[in-house]
Curated annotation (Swiss-Prot):
Composition bias, Polar residues: 363-374, 388-402, 521-533, 640-650
UniProt-annotated location(s): Chromosome
Region (VHS-like): 10-153
Record region (Disordered): 330-350, 362-403, 514-546, 640-664
Feature: compositional bias, Acidic residues: 334-347
Family: Belongs to the UVSSA family.
Binding site for Zn(2+): C476, C486, C494, H497
Location (main, coarse): nucleus
Matching InterPro entries: ENTH_VHS (IPR008942), UVSSA (IPR018610), UVSSA_C (IPR049431), UVSSA_N_a-solenoid_rpt (IPR049408)
Entry protein name: UV-stimulated scaffold protein A homolog
Highest rank taxon of the organism: Eukaryota
GO biological processes: response to UV
Keywords: Chromosome, Coiled coil, DNA damage, DNA repair, Metal-binding, Zinc, Zinc-finger
Length: 664
């Protein structure tokens, strides 16, 4: 009993610890410990089911979510636990799915949504596995799906669909592998022959390169006596390395053709044949055919071919013919040839770049001197050479530089891209520049297909979007009441201060004078300056008529000032007359409106009395009055006729509006 009590308390503690987490799943170690304790006895199963149902009543969706995970693990493994849970299935579904309106799922809402979807998924899984044995489980699933119309994930249909898709993919893969196997079986003899010929050519080239004539005896045999005298292992290893190094043959002008053939064959064997052999081996391992004898024989031959290729590769690597070394040698020769071509000019002048010249000079200095110069000296020499080069080019080609600077200033600025790499290039590019073997199920593949230069230029065409240059809009700079200047940036008119005009730092407008005013100012300034000059100086001037000109300018200035004063007084008088006229018009309009309103009231009273006292006589022959008749009668009435003179007066006022704009 004590052992059981200890186990019961332990399982309760583990379950509570597992459900207090904030993770998306239960800790696997705690779940494993719970399952191992529950497996101990039936009492542990009953205690765990009771504890889990109590935790499902907790007012937090995260606790219910983790509790549901533990229930699912134990439900799929224990028959007793299933029986105990199905007895309380109604309560479990309402607490996990929340289909009852009076028992909604607790907060947080995101975890509650996940709890609901997971509970629906677990219920469908339980029904698929144990619905045949438990009627309550079957009825609960049917009620939620058909009555409440809950959306289930339909695990069985999804599993069947996934299984069907996987089978279809496997069938397609088998069919593709079978077709590849048939094509490999047809061309296997030719494929094997090509690889054998390539390996044979590589061996013959290596024999030609390593042949030493009559002195073809290995150095190890000649030095066998000396080799026995060396007792130290370190010295012996150095001796072996030196012997191996002496066996390596360097590429020269005599054996260059053999090296080129060896380089091409090695590249073909590694980049093409070795990859094809490895693909064929993987194909034969995966393919499922009825004729296993043919497949096994082909697999054995491919393994032997792969071993021969690897052996040949190891042999030329031991001999010093590595691919990287051969390509480096070939590239260095090409660069040397290019440098020789650059130095051979018609006039004997050097036209290469300054940086290349400096680099060449540094290489010659390094080859002549055993000690290497420091980085500071190298930088100094490069800077001096560069400055000398720039000065020489400036002196020689000033006209060319001016034309180049002009073209650069007119040229548009573009972002660097791949289209500038092939600018005005007329070279054609191969479609399959990698040298791979491309297969196509739609037709024949041309391995030597090329892309013309005009097509490359069309593919590298770049579209640019026009961008308008941004111009800075000047601020309003009008003075504000609270101090400072207005900083609004409008194009023409500020909504608070009117048209935008040039202003100074204090907010005052800068008046832009007309050419006439400028001429007047110039004349006035000249006259002012001339007035300061004494009469003796003016008379002593070379021009005798200068005094007469000054007097004429002064008289003209006085006349203009008098004219301006007359115009100013006349405008002031007109303004006073307009003001008096407006006052008289307003006074007459006020008097006319009061008398007219009294006359209209008397007229309305008279008409209303006549209509009231008039006897209503109806005649069948009398013509009915229409709206048009009433309007015409109204227009020709005495009241309208009395207003005609006033309308004519209004017409006259409209005619005179332009002449006297401020008069009413």
């Amino acid at each position: 009993m004590e052992g059981r009590d200890d186990g019961g308390g332990k399982v309760i503690g583990l379950i509570e610890k597992a459900t207090k987490s904030t993770a998306q799943e239960v800790d696997p170690r705690l779940l494993k410990a719970i399952k191992s304790i529950v497996r101990y006895s039936d009492s542990e199963v009953r205690l765990s089911s009771q504890t889990l149902m109590e935790l499902m009543r907790h007012n937090h969706s995260q606790v219910r979510y983790l509790t549901l995970f533990i229930i699912d693990e134990l439900f799929m493994r224990s028959k007793l636990f299933r029986t105990l849970i199905i007895e309380n299935l109604d309560q479990l579904l309402s607490l996990s799915i929340g289909f009852r309106s009076n028992l909604p799922l607790p907060a947080p809402p995101a975890v509650a949504t996940t709890l609901r979807s997971k509970a629906i998924e677990f219920l469908e899984k339980w029904n698929l596995s144990f619905g045949f044995h438990y009627k309550e489980l079957r009825l609960g699933f049917d009620y939620l799906k058909n009555t409440l119309k809950l959306k289930f994930p339909d695990l069985q249909a999804n599993a069947a669909r996934i299984q069907r898709e996987r089978q279809e993919r496997e069938m397609k893969t088998k069919e593709i592998l079978r077709n590849k196997f048939d094509s490999l079986r047809v061309s296997f003899g030719l494929f094997k022959y090509e690889i054998e010929v390539t390996i044979k050519e590589i061996k013959e080239c290596m024999e030609i390169v390593q042949w030493r004539g009559d002195d073809g005896v290995p150095l190890a045999i000649l030095d066998e006596e000396d080799f026995e005298e060396i007792r130290c292992s370190h010295l012996r290893q150095i001796r072996l390395d030196s012997l191996k190094q002496s066996e390596k043959v360097e590429e020269t002008g005599e054996n260059r053709i053999v090296f080129d053939v060896l380089r091409e064959q090695c590249k073909l064997l590694v980049t093409k044949h070795l990859i094809s052999v490895q693909e064929g081996i993987s194909l034969l391992i995966r393919v499922d055919v009825s004729d296993n004898r043919t497949r096994d024989s082909m697999l054995k031959d491919l393994i032997d071919i792969r071993n021969n290729i690897l052996a040949a590769k190891k042999k030329w690597e031991e001999a010093g013919f590595t691919m990287s070394r051969m390509t480096d040698i070939h590239g260095n020769e090409e660069t040397n040839e290019e440098e020789e071509d650059i130095w051979e000019e018609d006039d004997g002048k050097v036209k290469t770049d300054s940086v290349k010249n400096v680099a060449h000079v540094m290489r010659t200095q390094q080859s002549e001197n055993s000690s290497l110069p420091s980085s500071g000296e190298a930088k100094k020499s490069t800077s001096e050479a560069r400055s000398n080069k720039v000065s020489n080019t400036k002196k020689v080609g000033s006209s060319g530089n001016s034309l180049r600077d002009k073209l650069i200033s007119e040229a548009p600025v573009m972002n660097w891209g791949s289209q500038l790499t092939n600018w005005e290039s007329t070279t054609e590019v191969r479609a399959n520049y990698r040298g791979l073997e491309i297969e196509s199920h739609w037709g024949r593949v041309d391995q030597d297909a090329i892309i013309p230069a005009d097509k490359i230029a069309e593919l590298n065409l770049q579209a640019t979007v026009y961008r308008e240059e941004r111009t800075e809009t000047p601020p309003c700079r009008a003075s504000l009441k609270k101090g400072g200047l207005c900083q609004r940036r409008d194009l023409r008119v500020c909504p608070f201060h009117g048209p935008i005009v040039p202003r100074d730092d204090e907010g005052n407008t800068i008046i832009q004078e007309s050419p006439l005013d400028e001429s007047e100012n110039q004349t006035s300034s000249t006259s002012g300056t001339n007035q300061d000059v004494s009469m003796d100086e003016t008379t002593s001037d070379s021009d005798p008529n200068q005094l007469a000109r000054q007097i004429a300018k002064e008289a003209l200035k006085n006349i203009r000032e008098k004219d301006k004063e007359v115009v100013r007084k006349r405008a002031k008088l007109v303004k006073v007359k307009v003001k008096e006229h407006n006052h008289e018009v307003l006074r007459g309009a006020a008097i006319a409106s009061t008398s007219r309103s009294n006359a209209m009231d008397d007229e309305f009273d008279r008409v209303f009395a006549e209509k009231k006292n008039k006897k209503q006589t109806f005649s069948t022959r009398r013509k009915k009055t229409t709206a048009k008749d009433r309007i015409s009668q109204r227009l020709f009435s005495n009241r309208v006729k009395g207003t005609n003179p006033q309308q004519l007066a209004q017409g006259n006022d409209e005619k005179c509006r332009d002449t006297s704009a401020n008069q009413w």
